[in-house]
Amino acid sequence: MGKNYVDIERDNGETLRYRKHVNGRGLIAHGAKVHASALIEAGAYVEPGAQVAAGARVLRGAWIESNAAIGPEAVIEEHAHIGEGAVVGSGARIGVRATVGDRARVAVGAKIRDDEIVGDGQIVATDKRGLRLAA
């Protein structure tokens, strides 16, 4: 039986310990809070201080930065990037390779399309098709 954690050294020399999540085997940093029912696929990372709620899905290669919050039943598609302090609302879907900037807010049920960028600090709501709504 192999070890259930991985140590990764940052550029500044600091070492972070990541444990493998029971549901999907993705890597969860010490200090992150991930609900047991959330799916964190292998190859996905959740950084310290981040929170992932019940039923959320973080797929292969996705990266959730420090202090970000992922709401219940939200889906973060493959290779998407959620910036530091960003919030993704309940039931929202972030597309493949999409980027949500630092401190950005994605509304409940919003759909961010593949390769789309939500800038730092932006607040985004969409209709069911993923078209952005006026603020």
Which residue ranges define each predicted feature?
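Extended, small-residue-rich solenoid/repeat segments and analogous flexible loops
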Residues: M1-N67
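Glycine-rich hexapeptide-repeat left-handed beta-helix
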Residues: G2-L27, P72-A135
